Curated annotation (Swiss-Prot):
A Pfam family matched in the record: LrgB
NCBIfam families: CidB/LrgB family autolysis modulator (TIGR00659), PRK10711.1 (NF007983)
Cytoplasmic topological domain residue ranges: 23-29, 112-118, 161-208
Protein name: Inner membrane protein YohK
KW Transmembrane (keyword) present: yes
Any one Gene Ontology cellular component term annotated for this protein: plasma membrane
UniProt keyword Cell wall biogenesis/degradation, yes or no: no
Organism: Escherichia coli (strain K12)
Keywords assigned: Cell inner membrane, Cell membrane, Membrane, Transmembrane, Transmembrane helix
Amino acid sequence: MMANIWWSLPLTLIVFFAARKLAARYKFPLLNPLLVAMVVIIPFLMLTGISYDSYFKGSEVLNDLLQPAVVALAYPLYEQLHQIRARWKSIITICFIGSVVAMVTGTSVALLMGASPEIAASILPKSVTTPIAMAVGGSIGGIPAISAVCVIFVGILGAVFGHTLLNAMRIRTKAARGLAMGTASHALGTARCAELDYQEGAFSSLALVLCGIITSLIAPFLFPIILAVMG
């Protein structure tokens, strides 16, 4: 057991940084470090019989670092404060519309495909951070665990393909790119933005926070409306 725990942290770091080197060298979207780490580590754990609990205990320090990492996102916001003040009305409008669209589209598609209201409620908060999504999903009758899975899936999609899509649409403005990524793919999209550009990361962080607040406030009122319209 101790051997399994000891290897968890170096395994995670080696795979992640190796994936970063590959991504920097080949510039291929699917070489996203998070995605590569999952593709490598999950089969490794299954093949070796190491339980997730053992793996998590060994790499728990990385989980503990998430809290200061989130707090550190406030610094880029402070650096861009003058631009945020100048555009605050547009920023709030964009985040509000983006949050509503994210909730309506995912939930509506799920209902059209025959999903139960419980599953639809779980999918609704897919574009916000995991703790908020689990709380919101549970409060409107969903299953928090499914909400968490949806958040991870959407975040990976955004981190892997988000910038490719923005480039294809010829969206070049840093603020617009950051707001789009933060609104659509929460923390994982924000992390990707922060890797590529300081200003993008700042605006993505702002969208991450605002969309979490907006979603938690309007989801309880919006979900019954979606059910009534789609039902």
